[in-house]
């Protein structure tokens, strides 16, 4: 299997995805990172590896809720989801998605013909932020996405 990753984009997801035939191999080849929930050692390794990727010019897609939504309600953000970007001091581009829950309404199969609305927010530059400002980034991003979700509804 040949994988072309022209835009150098990977994602951070649950280790479950690595076990899916074809998808797991493809995702690993484009440098996706897999988290094992409850495994601190794995989380630290992923943070260090992710920071390396970001410093090498890769972009990583992270879903800060840590899971898919089964409704239009936004879940709680995981505190660690911002550690990669704030540690690497790279820009964060918040993206609001609305309607993805329709894809899994029966929670078994992906439904075809569904629409997902996407709103890309302005980047948040972290390079010159103080520790205090970095600590406030998760709340700022969550507020932006929550506001974006209201716009898209």
Predicted regions and their residues:
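Non-catalytic C-terminal accessory region of glycerolipid acyltransferases
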Residues: 44-153
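Catalytic core of membrane glycerolipid acyltransferases/transacylases, capturing the structured
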Residues: 1-40
């Amino acid at each position: 299997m040949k994988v072309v990753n022209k835009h150098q984009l990977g994602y951070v997801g649950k280790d479950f995805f690595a076990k899916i035939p074809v998808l797991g191999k493809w995702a690993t080849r484009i440098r996706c990172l897999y988290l094992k929930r409850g495994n601190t050692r794995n989380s630290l390794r992923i943070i260090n590896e992710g920071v390396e990727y970001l410093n090498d010019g890769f972009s990583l897609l992270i879903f800060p809720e840590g899971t898919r939504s089964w409704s239009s309600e936004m879940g709680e953000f995981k505190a660690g989801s911002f550690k990669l970007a704030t540690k690497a001091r790279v820009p964060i581009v918040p993206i609001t998605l609305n309607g993805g829950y329709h894809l899994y309404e029966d929670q078994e199969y992906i439904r075809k013909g569904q629409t997902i609305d996407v709103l890309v927010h302005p980047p948040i530059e972290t390079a010159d932020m103080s520790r205090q400002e970095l600590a406030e980034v998760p709340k700022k991003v969550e507020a932006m996405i929550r506001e974006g979700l209201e716009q898209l509804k």
